[in-house]
Regions:
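Conserved alpha/beta-hydrolase "nucleophile elbow" surrounding the catalytic nucleophile
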Residues: 27-29, 89, 93-95
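Conserved acidic catalytic loop of the alpha/beta-hydrolase fold
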Residues: 72-89
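Short beta-strand/loop motif that positions the catalytic acidic residue
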Residues: 212, 218-220, 224
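Catalytic active-site module of serine/aspartate enzymes centered on a nucleophile-bearing elbow/loop
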Residues: 241-273
């Protein structure tokens, strides 16, 4: 396996396919780099260098007890970018991974970054607060943490329904995808899985938005039952100067799978533009 030993000894697993302008993919919760395989194959075949990593505590990366916060995740990305000496890199983050790449720019700047893509991302703020009334209530995330602690496998199996939107008429996702999703999710440590619920629900990225100074694409489904568009993608577009918004009508959270061809085409057009 290809890994990077981080500053605290954590082993960060990553895939590195193809050659050309680099695109670095940051995965969603509670998945791994494998969620990006279709995108990586697509871009590597078209002359790009596609890189995806397993966030600490997830997939094949090691499982530390602490460090499941966005400052740490951003610093992990910085180490990977430095290690691989990536320049003119396109950063793409899905769901909680959108927070990773956003915080990277806020903490480390955009000198090595060409563009940013936020797909079904939790930015700028996921949870409802006094000054952000459109997000899900804290009780929703309390329930997620409780469900994970009680029976993680069953909770995640059930969660896949709204993740892929298969409770909607006409939705079609194979049993193989459901099985793969659960298999990937259960590779993560329970501690990381639970702690990241707090990180992705409570981290306020609104101050980070003003620091994004590269062309940005926001992709979001308007029927996202996990990370509601009105609470996240819509506001991210409004807060990131000059960003481009692509709203997928009727699309669920997992657009990289359910709307793979459109995501790939939109990303390619954005990267080439």
């Amino acid at each position: 396996m290809t890994t990077l030993t981080l500053r605290d000894g954590t082993e960060l697993y990553y895939k590195d396919w193809g050659s050309g302008q680099p695109i670095l993919f940051s995965h969603g919760w509670p998945l791994s780099a494998d969620m990006w395989d279709s995108q990586m194959q697509f871009f590597a075949e078209r002359g790009y260098r596609a890189i995806a990593f397993d966030r600490r505590g997830f997939g094949r990366s090691s499982q530390p007890w602490t460090g499941f916060d966005y400052d740490t995740f951003a610093d992990d990305i910085a180490e990977l970018i430095e290690k691989l000496d990536l320049k003119n890199v396109v950063l793409a983050g899905f769901s909680m991974g959108g927070g990773d790449v956003t915080r990277y720019i806020a903490r480390h700047g955009s000198a090595r970054v060409a563009k940013l893509a936020l797909i079904s991302a939790v930015t700028p703020l996921f949870m409802k607060t006094a000054d952000h009334p459109v997000g899900p209530d804290k009780s929703v995330f309390d329930g997620i943490r409780a469900g994970l602690a009680a029976d993680r496998a069953q909770f995640l199996d059930d969660f896949s329904t709204i993740f892929y939107g298969t409770n909607r008429p006409g939705a079609a996702v194979s049993q193989g995808v459901f099985k793969q999703t659960l298999q990937i999710a259960l590779q993560a440590s329970l501690k990381a899985t639970i702690d990241c619920v707090t990180a992705f629900s409570e981290t306020d990225f609104r101050p980070d938005m003003a620091k994004i100074d590269v062309p940005t694409l926001v992709i979001h489904g308007d029927d996202d039952q996990v990370v509601p568009f009105e609470a996240t993608g819509k506001l991210a577009h409004e807060l990131i100067a000059g960003s481009r918004l692509e709203v997928y009508a009727g699309a669920p959270h997992a657009t990289c799978t359910t709307h793979r061809d459109r995501v790939n085409a939109d990303l390619l057009g954005f990267v080439q533009g």
